[in-house]
């Protein structure tokens, strides 16, 4: 593509990304800041890092430092909401859609390629698996880029050495980027790299391929390695991010999660089957691309066979693009004249349909529950009386301290799924040491914890209950505990829908 066409394509991808995320992202201006869970944890980690706390020492979770850096930059853009992350997400999705277009152009003319890209978000934002912004949203671009590189190699294995080197370096960068976001996704991308390496033997490019992959991976990882060696604790980083994260899926709590999500897992598995069948359609009469089927199965295995949360299936969605290439390409070959004329209108109609269909996952998109909002901001008002309050959660973080610059009280301030006994004991030790200004107890704890027992332990350390925060159809969800003496908001305290949409700084912090 010429520079002019490239810039025009990037601009269209950016506009489409903005529109998609404005209506479908939980971080959008249309959404309030309550109702976040995974993204609330990531935001807390990024915020803690930007405030001088040491990753994996002062705070920890099962995700990588690149994801926390993304959320830390989002925090710097806006301290008290997720709209900073929203704008960063637009950049990531712009790149994802642009790379998807480039991949389509390997097989299709510009107009059918554009229609494929317009349809693709139907899968990327599929409402049954995409309920909030998660780490997979930021992995999409690297998966798509690695798929593009492998497809180039599958299409023409006799590429010049410089092209082999360039594609290999990019795949290495993608590997390390995903390793630093969520390490099991790096294993999935490793399957694409393995196929590329195997194919490099035929044109005798294996040394160029291997060297490029190693160089790309090293360049991406080096800044983080140096940071942890010089300014943090590299050993603790390895222990927490790789070893402890692996161990969290080995225990009775994992069985509890499997039973809890079993029905959803069965429902979501049909998505994997649909994407697989679509890949078969693409590979029909294109058997040189059958290696993609092998990679698809490695991706599915990498998600976990015993337990796969619904958003894990997002990792498979980039493969759906190959089905679109096959079907859209066939339709354009049959009716080229009419389809080329209708492409702009079809792209607009498809975009509207994608947003309408996938908005099912966004509950209370334009107007959230008034009662939920009142409870959420009442809790935030109480916490705002402490400068940068330190929080501890019994169960998963839910973003209640986001509007008041709250920070983690300890390394395991929120409970990871499958938390080990050592993690739980350290949290109890921190509770006894009075590290937290506020403790939030969920009424939906894991099977090894009873609400009454947990609240008794919290109260024994001098904390008193302030209020129950309702969420999800006005059900009591969280109990806020704090030290005695904090004030409730005055009667005229109110957070309006306009405050939410304009992302006003409610507490003037």
Question: Predicted segments — roles?
Answer:
Residues 87-108, 145, 149:
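Transmembrane-helix motifs of polytopic, lipid-linked glycan transferases
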Residues 100-123, 140-141, 159, 166:
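Transmembrane-helix signature of polytopic, membrane-embedded enzymes
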Residues 128-139:
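Short acidic/glycine- and proline-prone juxtamembrane loop motifs at membrane-interface regions
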Residues 144-170, 204, 277-289, 328:
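Membrane-interface transmembrane helices that cradle and orient dolichyl/undecaprenyl
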Residues 163-183, 189-194, 218-219, 296-304:
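Membrane-interface alpha helices of multi-pass inner-membrane proteins
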Residues 187, 305-339:
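Hydrophobic/aromatic-rich transmembrane helices and adjacent perimembrane loops
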Residues 190, 194, 364-448, 472-473:
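Short periplasmic/luminal acceptor-recognition loop of GT-C membrane glycosyltransferases, typified by
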Residues 267-300:
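Hydrophobic, aromatic-rich transmembrane alpha-helices
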């Amino acid at each position: 593509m010429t520079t002019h066409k490239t810039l025009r394509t990037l601009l269209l991808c950016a506009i489409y990304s903005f529109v998609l995320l404005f209506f479908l992202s939980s971080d959008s201006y249309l959404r309030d800041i309550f109702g976040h869970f995974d993204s609330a944890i990531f935001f807390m980690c990024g915020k803690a890092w930007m405030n001088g706390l040491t990753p994996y020492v002062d705070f920890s979770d099962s995700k990588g430092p690149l994801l926390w850096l993304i959320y830390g930059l989002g925090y710097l853009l806006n301290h008290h909401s997720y709209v900073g992350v929203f704008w960063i997400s637009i950049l990531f999705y712009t790149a994802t859609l642009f790379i998807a277009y480039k991949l389509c152009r390997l097989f299709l003319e510009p107009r059918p390629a554009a229609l494929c890209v317009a349809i693709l978000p139907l899968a990327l934002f599929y409402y049954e698996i995409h309920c909030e912004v998660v780490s997979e949203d930021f992995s999409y671009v690297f998966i798509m880029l690695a798929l593009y590189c492998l497809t180039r190699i599958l299409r023409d294995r006799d590429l010049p050495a410089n092209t082999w080197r360039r594609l290999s370096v990019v795949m290495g960068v993608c590997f390390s980027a995903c390793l630093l976001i969520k390490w099991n996704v790096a294993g999935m991308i490793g399957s694409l790299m393995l196929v590329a390496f195997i194919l490099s033997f035929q044109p005798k490019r294996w040394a160029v391929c291997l060297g490029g992959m190693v160089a790309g991976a090293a360049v991406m990882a080096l800044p983080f390695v140096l940071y942890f060696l010089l300014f943090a604790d590299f050993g603790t980083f390895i222990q927490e991010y790789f070893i402890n994260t692996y161990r969290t899926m080995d225990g009775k709590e994992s069985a509890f999660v499997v039973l809890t999500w079993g029905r959803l897992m069965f429902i979501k598995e049909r998505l994997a089957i649909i994407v697989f069948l679509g890949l078969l359609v693409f590979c029909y009469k294109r058997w040189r691309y059958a290696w993609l089927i092998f990679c698809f199965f490695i991706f599915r295995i990498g998600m976990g066979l015993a337990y796969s949360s619904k958003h894990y299936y997002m990792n498979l969605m980039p493969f759906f693009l190959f089905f679109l290439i096959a079907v859209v390409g066939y339709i354009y070959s049959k009716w080229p004249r009419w389809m080329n004329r209708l492409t702009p209108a079809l792209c607009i109609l498809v975009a509207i349909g994608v947003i309408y269909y996938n908005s099912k996952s966004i509950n209370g998109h334009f107007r959230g529950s008034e009662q939920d909002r009142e409870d959420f901001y009442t809790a935030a008002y109480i916490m705002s009386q402490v400068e940068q309050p330190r929080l501890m959660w019994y169960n998963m973080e839910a973003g209640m301290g986001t509007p008041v610059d709250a920070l983690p009280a300890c390394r395991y301030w929120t409970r990871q799924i499958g938390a080990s006994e050592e993690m739980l004991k350290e949290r109890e030790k921190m509770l006894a040491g009075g590290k937290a200004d506020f403790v939030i107890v969920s009424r939906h704890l894991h099977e090894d914890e009873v609400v009454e027992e947990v609240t008794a332990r919290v109260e024994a350390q001098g904390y008193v209950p302030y209020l129950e925060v309702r969420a999800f159809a006005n059900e009591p969800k969280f109990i806020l505990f704090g030290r005695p003496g904090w004030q409730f908001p005055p009667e005229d305290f109110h957070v309006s829908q306009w405050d939410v949409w304009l992302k006003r700084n409610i507490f003037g912090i």
